[in-house]
Amino acid sequence: MGRPRTARVFMNVRVTTMDAELEFAIQQSTTGKQLFDQVVKTIGLREVWFFGLQYTDSKGDLTWIKLYKKVMSQDVQKGDPLQFKFRAKFYPEDVAEELIQDITLRLFYLQVKNAILSDEIYCPPETSVLLASYAVQARHGDYNKTTHVPGFLVNDRLLPQRVIDQHKMSKDEWENSITTWWQEHRGMLREDAMMEYLKIAQDLEMYGVNYFEIRNKKGTELWLGVDALGLNIYEKDDRLTPKIGFPWSEIRNISFNDRKFIIKPIDKKAPDFVFFAPRVRINKRILALCMGNHELYMRRRKPDTIDVQQMKAQAREEKNAKQQEREKLQLALAARERAEKKQQEYEDRLRTMQEEMERSQANLIEAQEMIRRLEDQLKQLQFAKDELEARQNELQVMIKRLEESKNMEVAERQKLEDEIRAKQEEVQKIQEEVSVKDTETKRLQEEVEEARRKQNEAAAALLAATTTPNHHHVDEEEEDNEEELTNGAENGTSRDYSKDFDTDEHIKDPVEERRTLAERNERLHDQLKALKQDLALSRDDTMETANDKIHRENVRQGRDKYKTLREIRKGNTKRRVDQFENM
């Protein structure tokens, strides 16, 4: 009988990215690189050089997995499944120049945003609000007052708790402030909003810096900051303002022996830069980060590899396709907005026409009533005139009889005279009535003339209200304009104890010409200034932190991230090493 085949032993692994959880089953022989490759293949990431797998070791410290060692032989905290985090280990010097894929952009954006919200990266209040507006654009797209009603952002984590605690503002007030700036980003793609977020965030002093507790030869407790631009030394109580800096271009070798860490400058006249870490494992981490950052620093200053060139070409194609799709969408949105605007115009005009018709109808009725009253008055006047004429005729007959009857008896004559007087009084009374009615009729005739004028105006207004003028027809030129718009339309390896670095004395320190985005962009500068003024009205100074005070003093003295880096890199290497020893 043959020997039974040994069953393969698999371990369950859970890898948490910034926006997903992945589960794998690995063998005892699986290396860190094999697991890493499986992760990046699953999520479609090609810019692998920025990232690593992080785990909590048996002592509770966060550690980066070693790519060329078996996963099971590393000090991973036991559990089922084994827990790992997929995180950015190295940061680009300039996100706009280096990040190629959308997935890379998204992972960096989510990691940096989380670091800002948890206060791992200090961010001043006004910048926090502006960044929040880009975060909302990245998540929700364009602001829409119909969909994004008050309270819409209540469950979104948008600001560091420190910023909220420092200002006497309600949730609604915070939302209003963020929404005001959110509306400024209308038409911006979600990926562009993430990029704008990172372009602002990379100017923050603590962005992309890994801090390590160290001591100099005097035993002074300090911080060592390792980032994409070099090494910086910070005083223990200030991680915002480095005091001494060494760019990667000045360093030719890094090594450590036990807890002693040695950095050899290119300038052979300069003494070694020596510091001490509390534990050997810290020195291993420092060395690994220095190696990776230095390699990327040098790689940026060489021509792109074929792989990177292909990635950039593909990214450009995808961006162009997305841009064309965006333009189509914007055209469709613009057409919809125009249609909605015209619909509103027609509704407003229809309402105006209705009101004009009602007013005209009322004027017409009033004019008709006036004419009817005049006609009645004219009839009464004519009746009075006819009656007056009849009485006058009767009076003439009576007078004639009086003149002809000279032989009439006295009594009879007296009676006739009395009748004549009575008739004269009656005629006089009727004449007065006719005179009054005549005056009233003239007044009414004037009113009728006015009424007829109003009637004509009302009829003309009624006709105008029911007729659409030519300028309300759709302009075909709009479609021509739309047609024109449519047509216009790189894994790091690590070695223990010592590492010689590639050097190039001709490399110019990138910090020399670097400026913050706010310094280069007047609009951003004005936005931050306006936000700072608005927030100052509700600020609670009693809640100010040590970092707030340091930041305020730096601003007062006109310092920013790159001005400080330029300042602390001045002078020769020996002077800066001596300065470090004397801290």
From Swiss-Prot:
- Ranges of biased composition (kind: Acidic residues): 476-485
Keywords, A to Z, come to:
Actin-binding, Cell junction, Cell membrane, Cell projection, Cytoplasm, Cytoskeleton, Membrane, Phosphoprotein
Report whether RNA-binding shows up as a keyword of the record: no
Q: Which GO terms describe its molecular function?
A: actin binding
Q: How does it sit in the membrane?
A: Peripheral membrane protein
One Pfam family here: FERM_C
Q: Which GO terms describe its cellular component?
A: adherens junction; cytoplasm; cytoskeleton; microvillus; plasma membrane; rhabdomere
Where is region (Disordered) located?
466-518, 539-558
| Keyword Amino-acid biosynthesis on entry | no
Residues in coiled coil: none
**Annotated FERM domain residues:** 11-301
- Regions of biased composition (Basic and acidic residues) lie at 496-518
| Compartments, as annotated in UniProt | Cell junction, Adherens junction; Cell projection, Microvillus; Cell projection, Rhabdomere; Cell membrane
Q: Cite the CDD domains for this sequence.
A: FERM_B-lobe, FERM_C_ERM, FERM_F1_ERM
| SMART domains assigned | B41, FERM_C
Which GO BP terms sit in this record?
A: animal organ morphogenesis; establishment or maintenance of epithelial cell apical/basal polarity; neuron differentiation
Gene3D superfamilies linked: 1.20.5.450, 1.20.80.10, 6.10.360.10, Phosphatidylinositol 3-kinase Catalytic Subunit, Chain A, domain 1, Pleckstrin-homology domain (PH domain)/Phosphotyrosine-binding domain (PTB)
Source domain of life is Eukaryota
Give the sites modified to Phosphothreonine: T564
Subunit arrangement? Answer: Interacts with cytoskeletal actin.
Q: Relate the protein's function as given in its record.
A: Involved in connections of major cytoskeletal structures to the plasma membrane.
Q: What is this protein called?
A: Moesin/ezrin/radixin homolog 1
Source organism of the structure: Aedes aegypti
